[in-house]
UniProtKB/Swiss-Prot annotation:
Protein name: Large ribosomal subunit protein uL23
Family classification: Belongs to the universal ribosomal protein uL23 family.
Functional description taken from the UniProt entry: One of the early assembly proteins it binds 23S rRNA. One of the proteins that surrounds the polypeptide exit tunnel on the outside of the ribosome. Forms the main docking site for trigger factor binding to the ribosome.
Keywords of the record: Ribonucleoprotein, Ribosomal protein, RNA-binding, rRNA-binding
Source organism: Azotobacter vinelandii (strain DJ / ATCC BAA-1303)
Gene expressing this chain: rplW
Amino acid sequence: MNQERVFKVLLGPHISEKATVLAESKKQFVFKVATDATKLEIKKAVEALFDVKVANVTTLNVQGKTKRTVRGLGKRNDWKKAYVALQPGQDLDFASSAE
């Protein structure tokens, strides 16, 4: 996988209460990823960017909600979420990996 694709696969971390609990208890981290990204691409991107070993990747497609606006009904975009489980002994620290 080329370097450009690595940066396009991971769009950013998904921050929520569930994601925080998973990160602290099971060393699983949640990312927003490109809708066309595969599990293997996500695994390689996380390993390349954060220098960790990935044990498992689980993905799901999140359907965009329909919202009512002044101009009628609108729809938020669909997006893809990935749960990345690290191998035992590995830890991912967003602050130190950004440097």
